[in-house]
């Protein structure tokens, strides 16, 4: 679903008649939803005493993501159906009906993307929390590494689905519409299958609290927000610096992730002078190459971080002035992160 939004979100909104400036107001839902949903929903699931403490939020977020995806994919037929109910327009030949249908489609699509961003951020934070719940302190680094690998693999599969021509698949003919609608339905179904497997085969156990009186939802949300603020103010200085760097890095990643396919489409339109699904598939192919490179980097670069894996006795056997000892000390995740940030800035 995330691949669907990144690869086809901006081109789809532009095809509905929204300007490039207006799409920026749509995508502001991404960081805004992450700022709100991830800490609040994570805190709510932490305080839950149910034996389904994480999974109930995961299933709820998954359901909302699926509904929002279908709302976006079928926004045009839904808008026509709503116009028929209200009785706007005399028929398909009425220009006023087309005008209202276009505006209604834009409203439903923008609303769907906002709901999708909030729900998918909730699904992401619950998934990460569920992984850490079942990993010991000694296994959390490995669990996070596998989480990153699965994200990269999902991105590759998602961008591949956006690259191939789904209109030629007979099994998807019942969906109707173009490439975007079929890609949306496929991504929603795959997400539902993966979340269902996770919820069925991941056990949880309820937590016990000393409080005997149940609190209301609004009270729990307020307490969660206050807790997040307190934790944020008490962060160590090195962690605050990392957060500041990530803030600035995200500002540069934002236009790349959401507008890279549009950039590829603009170059294709200058050459072909026309719009088609093939151009959108070309944008997905560009993101597929990006996902493949990210997968390779995620697998190779951590293994190059020798300083965190070299045992101290082995390090001490090297001569203090040897070049090998200096290289081992210098090759760390922090060094790779700094070098990656520099390349991103360039």
Task: For the regions a language model picked out, list residue spans one by one.
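Loop-to-transmembrane helix entry
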Residues: 12, 19-29, 145-146, 178-182, ...
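Central cavity-lining transmembrane alpha-helices of secondary-active solute carriers
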Residues: 23-48, 61-74, 152-160, 288-303
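Intracellular loop-helix junctions on the cytosolic face of multi-pass helical membrane proteins
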Residues: 96-109, 114, 122-123, 127-128, ...
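C-terminal ends and interior cores of transmembrane alpha-helices
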Residues: 59-102, 339-346
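Intracellular helix-loop hinge segments at the cytoplasmic ends of transmembrane helices
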Residues: 11, 128-134, 262
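Helix-to-loop junctions at the C-terminal end of transmembrane segments
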Residues: 35-52, 166, 295-335
């Amino acid at each position: 679903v995330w691949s669907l939004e990144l690869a086809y979100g901006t081109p789809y909104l532009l095809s509905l008649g929204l300007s490039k400036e207006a799409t920026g107001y749509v995508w502001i839902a991404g960081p805004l939803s992450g700022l709100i949903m991830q800490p609040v929903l994570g805190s709510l699931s932490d305080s839950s005493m149910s034996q389904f403490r994480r999974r109930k939020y995961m299933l709820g977020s998954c359901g909302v993501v699926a509904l929002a995806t279908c709302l976006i994919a079928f926004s045009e037929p839904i808008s026509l159906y709503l116009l028929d109910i209200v009785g706007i327009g005399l028929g398909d030949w009425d220009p006023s009906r087309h005008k209202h249908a276009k505006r209604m489609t834009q409203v439903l699509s923008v609303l769907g993307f906002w709901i999708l961003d909030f729900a998918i951020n909730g699904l992401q934070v619950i998934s990460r929390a569920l992984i850490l719940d079942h990993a010991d302190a000694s296994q959390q680094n490995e669990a996070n590494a596998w989480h990153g690998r699965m994200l990269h693999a999902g991105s590759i599969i998602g961008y591949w689905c956006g690259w191939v021509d789904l209109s030629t698949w007979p099994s998807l003919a019942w969906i109707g519409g173009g490439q975007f609608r079929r890609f949306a339905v496929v991504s929603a179904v795959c997400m539902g299958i993966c979340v269902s497997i996770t919820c069925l085969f991941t056990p949880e156990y309820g937590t016990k609290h000393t409080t005997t009186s149940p609190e209301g939802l609004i009270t729990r949300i307020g307490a969660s927000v206050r807790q997040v603020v307190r934790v944020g103010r008490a962060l160590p200085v090195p962690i605050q610096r990392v957060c500041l760097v990530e803030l600035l890095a995200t500002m540069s990643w934002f236009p790349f992730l959401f507008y890279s396919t549009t950039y590829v489409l603009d170059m294709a339109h200058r050459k072909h002078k026309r719009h088609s699904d093939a151009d959108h598939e070309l944008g997905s192919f560009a993101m597929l190459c990006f996902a493949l490179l990210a997968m390779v980097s995620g697998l190779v670069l951590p293994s190059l971080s020798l300083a965190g894996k070299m045992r101290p006795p082995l390090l001490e056997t090297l001569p203090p002035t040897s070049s090998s000892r200096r290289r081992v000390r210098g090759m760390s995740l922090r060094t790779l992160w700094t070098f990656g940030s520099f390349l991103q800035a360039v």
